[in-house]
């Protein structure tokens, strides 16, 4: 049995993450500095963090990855990571992804998507129920389905990240200086990074559009 290591120095060196999702305006520590802090991990724990980081970075690229590819990567993660807490966290992330994908498929009158068992089987069995009979465990399913009626992918991504944030924040209040606390910090940091990068990408596109518009007006002056 592996001994559980406490990481007082590591946790103490990490800047606090915001308590509220509304405060996710910037990452409190850069990826480079975070990597430096994580060098304090024991080798086995460092491997778990590496596998989690690789999976999370890979999973957040929906335009480049098919559901089948993500499931293969998820199976690989479970085979190679023996930390139960880390596996449970990634499993929950995949469950949320599967529910969102199922709601989209149903809206488009497609077949149920592949997903993580047993939730994929539950969804397929209850395909015609509004919340796939998952409402007791995931009370937000109906609201996500309602959001899909509109044309607001930004709001849907915000909801997905906020749901994950709330759960991780609750769990973080139960873990302090253990490796589990490090895992929870990484998961929450990744959400902050994803959200702030999304804002940065939007801002860059707006800036580029302003430049394009301005250049167009400039060209028209001499047209």
Each model region followed by its residue ranges:
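Extended alpha-helical surfaces
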Residues: 1-223
């Amino acid at each position: 049995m592996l001994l559980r290591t406490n990481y007082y120095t590591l946790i103490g060196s990490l800047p606090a993450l915001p308590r509220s999702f509304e405060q996710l305006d910037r990452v409190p520590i850069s990826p480079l500095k975070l990597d430096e802090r994580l060098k304090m991990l024991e080798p086995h724990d460092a491997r778990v963090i590496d596998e989690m980081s690789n999976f999370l970075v890979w999973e957040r690229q929906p335009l480049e990855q098919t559901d089948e590819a993500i499931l293969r990567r998820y199976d690989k993660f479970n085979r190679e990571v023996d930390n139960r807490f880390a596996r449970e966290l990634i499993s929950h992330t995949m469950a949320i992804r599967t529910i969102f994908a199922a709601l989209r498929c149903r809206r488009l009158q497609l077949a149920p998507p592949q997903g993580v068992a047993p939730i994929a089987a539950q969804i397929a069995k209850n395909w015609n129920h509004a919340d796939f009979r998952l409402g007791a465990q995931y009370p937000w399913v109906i609201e996500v389905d309602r959001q899909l009626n509109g044309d607001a992918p930004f709001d849907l991504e915000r909801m997905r990240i906020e749901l994950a944030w709330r759960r991780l924040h609750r769990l973080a209040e139960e873990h302090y200086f253990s490796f589990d606390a490090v895992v929870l910090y990484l998961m929450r940091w990744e959400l902050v990074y994803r959200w702030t990068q999304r804002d940065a990408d939007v801002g860059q596109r707006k800036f580029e559009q302003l430049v394009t518009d301005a250049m167009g007006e400039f060209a028209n002056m001499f047209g």
